[in-house]
Amino acid sequence: MVTKLFLRPHSLSFTLLSGIHLFPKTSLSKPITLCLLSTTATTPILTLTQTLDPNLSYGPSLHKGTKPLNHQNHQLIAATPGEEECVFDKEAFTRVFNLTAIRVPSKDCFALENRLRGHLLNWPRIRNVARVPGDEVEDGLVKLLGEKRNSSDGSESEGDFDSLNRRIYGKAEGDGEILSPVLYRDTLAKTFDSQGFANFRNLAKLSRPKKKKRRKEEERSEGKKRTGKNEFAMVEVVEDGEEGEDLRGLLGEEFKRKRWRGSTRLLLLDERYADKGVEELPEAIKAVLKEDTGQSMTSTFELVKCKLTLFYNYWQMNEILEALLPEGMIVPSAFEMVGHIAHLNLRDEHLPYKKLIAKVVLDKNKPKIQTVVNKTDAIHNDYRTMQLEVLAGNRSLVTTVIENGMRFQVDLATVYWNSRLATERQRLLNCFTRNDVVCDVFSGVGPIAISAAKKVKRVYANDLNPYAIEYLESNSVLNKLERKIKVFNMDGRRFINAMFTSDKAESITQVVMNLPNDAAEFLDAFRGIFRKKSRDKQLKLPMIHVYGFSKAQDPEFDFHQRIRIALSEVAVDVEMHRVRLVAPGKWMLRASFILPKSVVFAKAVLYM
């Protein structure tokens, strides 16, 4: 799996100070402090300063909103010299936004959401329909409690709930004054009959334990996640439009001073309407409120003030890094994934902050990412292994990669793997048929050889790296293809000579040479491979697929020239394909051509 890397600058101002620790203040308009340490020495201390722009773009931003009061004095837990991990205060990224919402019955919320879609919040990863504690009432309870009814003269008559509520709290009928304990007991005694409760039968039903089995703990916890605070956001009602009766005695503390209306939901309105009254709202919203008022003497829709709190987990990786890194620095916003490992290629300017960047990458991509590494040097050795530094997470570099439906175990410390070539490998596999016999000269752990073995007749795979051969053999067994793959561990030229001087030579139809730095230099090994055979014999010459890099202005012409020089053959019909741009001005290419007859019957090249 590959994540493309996009680098972009940002506009947060940066000040370099001296000191040991960095501390975030109440908002990004004040300094945020970081602890940036290496294993050998401390780096300069950085303080980040941001100026709020009154014309910020639509949507949530760390530049907008306020910090909650209990986080005003939060400071970073700074690491001390010698610690490997860089720790920063995640609470410093909590932001509170004041909003207006419409409280509506739960049965109407989705229809109204579609109707008012353009006037709702519509923020990424935030639902327009919000839940708060106490907004859900079971259907059975609603039926028992009933609701207020409108009489024929337009006045509201007493509902079942009002009568029941008075009896629960010992209030008199009519004026609703609280009865003395003696009168209350006397009233209760008169309501009894031979069958038990008469007027209290609803209360008796409420007090009985449920006959159904209680839900499992997992189900109850799942239901709780839908209300209140979750891992990245929380909605709270700050101000109700109207106070009602105190329902704590019947329904619990969550229903203190709420007007009875059954199960409800909040439709979060656009942030533009946060401080506006009803008359200032758009006509579409006012029409909904008027329709509801016209249908009933008591409106079931209600405007409420609420606040939306966004936590550290809400913000994207690039937003966090943009807030933490100095002004003008390019923000690394993506990386390559190899199994559970995130592979960074940090620039020199990022190295003082590598621990910080790795920490954010790990936080924002759990659980699929468990290790973050950075390449410390270019590939120079014959085994093509990279020098990697583990920056965060698990120290193990052994992982499992799934590609083209196959599983590959790799150890990035001892073998080479590039996930960015997955598309090219699939494109190459599409060139093969079920009758092909493939010869992979530089197979590595087998991304091409094993994937091809599922499709073609036979595969011969070779690599110089003994660790790669071990993983190649285990991966072939892992994918149940060991019977179709024969593995070799030798130099590329020796392998080509051994294969094409054996009885297998005439069966080989495809040769893959995926060693972009040096593959073209191995083409001279094909000169004279059939020199001992008769020219009159009908031979099916193999198709060669060779990869290479080119920094030339015309990369195709440059690579074609190198192929002709290596083969000592002028007339070579080559099909070129640009694989990817690996660096500014540097292309990776694939050249495909049928091995010329004049090359295979030429005199052999002597190697000194």
Swiss-Prot record:
GO molecular function, one term: tRNA (guanine(37)-N1)-methyltransferase activity
Transmembrane segments: none
Alphabetical UniProt keywords: Cytoplasm, Methyltransferase, Mitochondrion, Nucleus, S-adenosyl-L-methionine, Transferase, tRNA processing
Residues that hold S-adenosyl-L-methionine according to the record: 425, 463-464, 491-492, 514
Catalytic activity: guanosine(37) in tRNA + S-adenosyl-L-methionine = N(1)-methylguanosine(37) in tRNA + S-adenosyl-L-homocysteine + H(+)
Tree of life domain: Eukaryota
Major place of residence: mitochondrion
Disordered: region residues: 207-229
Self-association and partners: Monomer.
Recorded family membership: Belongs to the class I-like SAM-binding methyltransferase superfamily. TRM5/TYW2 family.
Role of this protein: Specifically methylates the N1 position of guanosine-37 in various cytoplasmic and mitochondrial tRNAs. Methylation is not dependent on the nature of the nucleoside 5' of the target nucleoside. This is the first step in the biosynthesis of wybutosine (yW), a modified base adjacent to the anticodon of tRNAs and required for accurate decoding.
The protein's name: tRNA (guanine(37)-N(1))-methyltransferase 1
Species for this entry: Vitis vinifera
Species lineage: Eukaryota, Viridiplantae, Streptophyta, Embryophyta, Tracheophyta
